[in-house]
């Protein structure tokens, strides 16, 4: 007996999330829509390292030390792992307010500010919060309909509010925020070391080959090495400079967004309330602190829309999927067997009982 199982398509929350992000692997991977520069990053790293492992490492492992390709492989794998983690993870997107929540916030704002006369500009929607004896302003996001937490900002590219927003990095194809900043920093740090490492041993390789066949002949025989040197030379300055800048920000417990806006170094000279005044403590908090869980329920299941027909319950569904076996019947006489074609409403009424024998004789 064959049983047909009807499966309904489950709608995940990531399919209905607002914003300009793209999702893969059933919501497990989250990126920005503009991924062209991210693919360029992958191509440059993979292409340069492939040439280095294919040509220079084989020669240097024999002539110098077999540890050279081993250390290069470790740097390469660590750089790729941190890049993919920073690119594919949730940077700390804050969910938008539901319609009921947005209406409640609007009522609170109207009750606080009062009715604004027509033609006049409404006052700025700001709340004050105290952090380490410093007043921090919480701004209202007109897109997400929420008061943003401290250090959060709205990314115009991804169209989402991100907690502890640092910047939007096209090289990793994602925003850099509270949940992936440490991986971004480790990526640019390891990439700087890898670039210096490949560049230095390319120079060593050219020098060793030049001692045997000459400098010009070496350049003619190794065009891949020349290409690697050019890529590493022009990449080195930007990557190392970016790493130094973010090392400075980590030491101060500051974000790129705050540094650009001059939040703690402007005219007011307001002290940074998030800094511990100690470089070691700031580095430990930013890079080694507990990683907060994602508040964006990407893989949650949306509830079924209410319709006229009630969906079957779990017990009804499970019982309907099981093969039904006929109930055992007792041996009945032909006189006692009921008619299958008749329903309880169609069964004939019972015959009236016969009068007692004594009553019949009295009537006679």
Swiss-Prot record:
Which residue spans adopt a coiled-coil conformation according to this UniProt entry?
Answer: none
Q: Where is the active site?
A: 169 (s-palmitoyl cysteine intermediate)
Q: Where is the composition biased (Polar residues)?
A: 310-323
Q: Which InterPro entries match?
A: Palmitoyltrfase_DHHC, PFA4/ZDH16/20/ERF2-like
Q: Which GO terms describe its biological process?
A: peptidyl-L-cysteine S-palmitoylation; positive regulation of pyroptotic inflammatory response; protein targeting to membrane
Q: Where is the DHHC domain?
A: 139-189
Query: Mind listing the UniProt keywords for this protein, alphabetically?
Result: Acyltransferase, Endoplasmic reticulum, Golgi apparatus, Lipoprotein, Membrane, Palmitate, Transferase, Transmembrane, Transmembrane helix
Q: Which domain of life is it from?
A: Eukaryota
**Pro residues bias locations:** 346-356
Q: Which segments cross the bilayer? A: 36-56, 64-84, 184-204, 229-249
Localization per Swiss-Prot or TrEMBL: Endoplasmic reticulum membrane; Golgi apparatus membrane
Q: According to the UniProt record, which cysteines are disulfide-bonded?
A: none
Question: What are its E.C. numbers?
Answer: 2.3.1.225
| An example molecular function term from Gene Ontology annotations | protein-cysteine S-palmitoyltransferase activity
Lumenal-facing ranges: 57-63, 205-228
* Pfam family name, one: DHHC
What kind of membrane protein is this, topologically? Multi-pass membrane protein
Cytoplasmic side: which ranges?
1-35, 85-183, 250-364
Its family remark reads: Belongs to the DHHC palmitoyltransferase family. ERF2/ZDHHC9 subfamily.
Q: What does this protein do?
A: Palmitoyltransferase that catalyzes the addition of palmitate onto various protein substrates, such as ADRB2, GSDMD, HRAS, NRAS and CGAS. The ZDHHC9-GOLGA7 complex is a palmitoyltransferase specific for HRAS and NRAS. May have a palmitoyltransferase activity toward the beta-2 adrenergic receptor/ADRB2 and therefore regulate G protein-coupled receptor signaling. Acts as a regulator of innate immunity by catalyzing palmitoylation of CGAS, thereby promoting CGAS homodimerization and cyclic GMP-AMP synthase activity.
Quaternary structure and interacting proteins, as annotated: Interacts with GOLGA7.
Question: Domain description from the entry?
Answer: The DHHC domain is required for palmitoyltransferase activity.
Under which name does UniProt file this protein?
Palmitoyltransferase ZDHHC9
**What is the species of this protein?**
Pongo abelii (Sumatran orangutan)
